[in-house]
From Swiss-Prot:
Residues 471-487 have a biased composition (Basic residues). This is GTPase Der. Transmembrane segments: none annotated. SUPFAM superfamilies: P-loop containing nucleoside triphosphate hydrolases. Keywords: GTP-binding, Nucleotide-binding, Repeat, Ribosome biogenesis. Belongs to the TRAFAC class TrmE-Era-EngA-EngB-Septin-like GTPase superfamily. EngA (Der) GTPase family. One of its GO terms (biological process) is ribosome biogenesis. GTP 1 binds at residues 9-16, 56-60, 119-122. GTPase that plays an essential role in the late steps of ribosome biogenesis. PANTHER family: GTPASE DER.
Amino acid sequence: MSFTLAIVGRPNVGKSTLFNRLVGKRLALVDDQPGVTRDLREGDARLIDLRFTVIDTAGLEEVTDDSLQGRMRRLTERAVEMADVCLFLIDGRVGVTPSDEVFADILRKKNAHVILGVNKAEGRAGDAGAIEAWSLGLGEPVRLSAEHGEGMDDLYHILRPIAEGFAERAAADAPVVDVDVSEEEADLEADPDAHKPTVKRPLQIAVIGRPNAGKSTLINKIIGEDRLLTGPEAGITRDAISVRSEWQGTPIRIFDTAGMRKKARISDKLEKLSVADGLRAVRFAEVVVVLLDVEIPFEQQDLRIADFAETEGRAVVVAVNKWDLEGEKQEKLAELKEMFDRLLPQLRGAPLVTVSAKTGRGLDRLHAAILKAHDIWNRRITTARLNSWLGAMVEAHPPPAPGGRRIKLRYMTQVKTRPPGFVVMCSHPDEMPDSYRRYLVNGLRDHFDMPGTPIRLTMRGQGDKNPFKERKFRTPSRLRKHLGKKG
């Protein structure tokens, strides 16, 4: 019973509150200030046994120019055309306004299924607005309180027959496919490519950066349509907007985030909410694209953003935007690489890609870099290979001997992926200097081809149980002396 429902209406009638109610999470920013929502935000909605896609839209306003409000209105009209059903919300406490009448007329012409909802209609305060709503000519209004969850049953009974109609149509149009889905799912764990993106498990990408770096423009170019609001004004995006799409054959879910300024500059309450929303999007993501402006790259805030993504353990790709504006490309590229290596040593080897979100140049390279970063982030190395490598590393450069006691490295294993995490069993783990840890981490990157991805390395003492104690490994002779084995 899958269909798409767009929630539309004037600013501040409760669209985002209802969106959050339907998706069961606080995904959209909510505030009593009009115009909080500026982009189209999609979510997986659930209403009793109905499952559908819901779109939260910017408020409809009576403007048609190229102002910010005008572009917001055009995005909303696009959502109306995309949706199977429109839920037109008015404010029950305010009643029907002249703008409501104009937009009701527009919706009648643009969409076959329009449901009229009177929000904030709890108690007697909403009675007059609910009665007045009949004058819009959209049929019987459904009384709702998005904030308190009232009227959801009534909305369900209106949506159910519409959903059944779409389900019957989809079943009639669906091709017959001779595939045992259960067998495919059962083989997923045995598949070495199990981490590859699929429609059910798309690659999660977050695009982050300072305000006006071109994040929304880049995403619009990637997905091939104007889904996100763009313009010269810094800070247009306020939410972390998520869009599902396919990019050069790769199923993706891509997050656009609010621009992240220095904390001292974040004074507006909405902007604080937006930045926190962007940080949450990083935690949802698998690959984070840090987008820089070629004219002012590697500002202090860029470095903080990249460091945050690495600290969160996400695969990182650095993209330098507005490359079409750069005249001396070779000299600038050499300068960017030098700055990257010097200012972000924790991301040594991470891909640096030049792009133009405006023209689309460089998106092929960006796509390839994201897929490679995701593959490395999911990489698993066998214990035998790790211990063979560890023996060679110790032989080339033995651990220090603090207080005259040599630190002995017993064995090593990988304990997790996403990002790769390793444990080394050793004597005196607390005395292992950071310089030797970096030596091992850099060696892992170089030997196993894992540039740029965060690597977690933990030292554990001999008191911890060795899960490989009873197992026999065929190890090189030079490693046996370090593992305490007898030939």
